[in-house]
Each structure stands twice: as C-alpha cells, then as structure tokens.
C-alpha cells in the first residue's frame, strides 16, 4: 500500500471519507472480493474438516485432536460465556490441528497462527447471522493490519518470536471484529493495538520443532484475547495512549533482542525442558 503506517492510512481515510475496507478496495481493485471469497471458503472448510477429524496428530508427540470433542462437549444449562469460549476455541483448535496434520489452511498471517482469525469470524457470523459479504470486508481489514505488521515489524517467529506470529494474528482478528461490527477507525486501531501489546515478549519454543505444543492451544487463547480486545476498544477508546504503529515498532525491537533459543529453534523454553518420557 502507498501509505507506510496506520497513522497515514487513517489520515487518508478521513480525508477521503472512506472506511478501511474501502481503502483496501481502492488499492487492490474490485477483484479483491473474489479472492477473499475464496479465502473465506477455505477457512470455513478448514474448520469443518478439523471438527470432523479424530485421532492423533503425526510427529511422535502423541497429541490427540481435541476440536471435535471440545465442540460437542456442551452441558445442560451451559452459561453463555462458557459456550462462547468452547465454540471459539473449538474452531481455533480445528484449524490448528488441520495445519499440524498437513491439511489445507489459510496463513493468517502464518501457518502456526492460522486458527485465530477464522475462529472469531466464523463464531460471530453464525451467532449474529452476518452475510458473507460483510465478513469479506472484515477479512480485508484483517489483511491490512497484517500487511502493516509485515512491513514495519515482523510476522516471523524465527525472527521475532511468537509475538510476531500469534500477536499479529490476534491483532488481525481484533481489527476484523471491529470492521465486522461497525466500529470506528479509531476503535479498530485500538483493538489491534491491545491485541498486539499483550503478546509482547512471547517466545516461540515449539516442542520437537512441531507446530503442536504450545502452538495449537495458543491459537485458541489468542482467539479469545482478540474478542476481549474488540470489546475493550469500544469501551475505552477515548483514553488510549499507545498507537498501533508504536506497538508494532516495539514488537520488532523486542523480538530482535529475544535470544535465538526462543525464536523457533526449539533450543530453549518448553522445547528444551519437555521430557517426552515423563509426559507419556
């Protein structure tokens, strides 16, 4: 995109009286909607495939697929907040388990963080009967924020730790929720900033180098955190002090100072201390 920061994009949108999704269309052309329709269909299929699958994931860690069981584990008189948690997390598990089993997923922004965005969007669509066309607008906004992080920060766990992957996914999902539910540009920025800020410093230490532990569960937690960021942004936007651009720069600087042991090498953290014999 011609603008280099979110501040520049927001200023341009205000000047032209357009939304963030309209900004994306202005730069990408109308063909972007056909592309995003394919993206959305692939995301929904990944959730469906993951919810239908059972068994153990490949790789030797004996990680059981949990999405199907989680999705079906409703209880009588289940509280609404528990149901939301269960369904959103089941969707995130489904996509992440498909990724771990060489299934077809959409990088958002990476394979290891692919479960966050489809989980929150599909839950909101089904809960509020939102048409696909509106979801595509939200996907456009998610992609815009992901592109900004890629340009000014990093989306690579090998470069900046898991904050760069799951933190970006959480920001994209929070921004998408704002677009989906009609929040302002300022509220959208704030949600994306909250989502990234509270992943700062997160390490990438996959056990045995597999995108399973802690990666799959982390997608579910980040999906819920994106929903929290979305809700908070609508309540507190007027009193914020940190911009999205600032938190992205902070993430990049933080990531470059994280030891290489905690940047996808599996030489530190959980990957180092995990004892497969004790776990089994």
Question: Would you name each region that the model predicts?
Answer:
Residues 1-26:
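Flexible glycine-/small-residue-enriched beta->alpha junction loops
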Residues 4, 34-42, 83-90, 100, ...:
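Conserved active-site and cofactor/substrate-binding residues in soluble primary-metabolism enzymes
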Residues 14, 25, 48, 52, ...:
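Generic surface-pattern signal
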Residues 30-161, 269-280:
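Accessory "access/gating" subregions that flank catalytic or transport cores
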Residues 90-94, 115-125, 140-148, 163-179, ...:
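Contiguous, well-ordered alpha-helical segments that form the cores/surfaces of helical PPI scaffolds
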Residues 107-108, 151, 157-160, 164, ...:
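Generic structural "secondary-structure junction" signal
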Residues 122-126, 153, 157, 168, ...:
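Amphipathic, positively biased hydrophobic alpha-helical segments used for protein targeting
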Residues 175-280:
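Functionally critical mobile loop/hinge segments
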């Amino acid at each position: 995109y011609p603008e280099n920061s979110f501040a520049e994009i927001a200023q341009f949108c205000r000047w032209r009286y357009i939304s963030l999704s309209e900004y994306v269309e202005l730069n990408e052309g109308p063909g972007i909607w056909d592309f995003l329709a394919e993206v959305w269909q692939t995301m929904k299929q990944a959730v469906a495939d993951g919810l239908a699958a059972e068994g153990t994931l490949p790789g030797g860690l004996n990680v059981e697929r949990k999405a199907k069981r989680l999705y079906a584990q409703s209880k009588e008189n289940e509280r609404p907040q528990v149901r939301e948690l269960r369904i959103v997390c089941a969707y995130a598990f489904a996509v992440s388990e498909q990724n771990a089993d060489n299934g077809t997923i959409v990088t958002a922004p990476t394979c290891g963080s692919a479960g966050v965005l489809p989980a929150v969007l599909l839950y909101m669509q089904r809960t509020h009967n939102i048409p696909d066309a509106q979801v595509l607008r939200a996907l456009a906004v998610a992609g815009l924020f992901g592109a900004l992080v890629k340009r000014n920060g990093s989306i690579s766990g090998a470069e900046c730790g898991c904050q760069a992957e799951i933190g970006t996914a959480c920001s994209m999902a929070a921004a998408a929720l704002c677009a989906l539910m009609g929040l302002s540009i300022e509220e959208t920025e704030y949600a994306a900033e909250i989502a990234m800020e509270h992943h700062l410093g997160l390490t990438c230490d996959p056990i045995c180098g597999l995108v399973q532990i802690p990666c799959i569960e982390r997608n579910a937690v980040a999906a819920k955190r994106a929903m929290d960021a979305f809700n908070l942004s609508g309540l507190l936007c007027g009193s914020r002090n940190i911009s999205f651009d600032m938190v992205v720069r902070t993430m990049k600087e933080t990531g470059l100072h994280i030891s290489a042991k905690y940047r996808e090498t599996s030489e530190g953290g959980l990957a180092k201390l995990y004892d497969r014999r004790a776990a089994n």
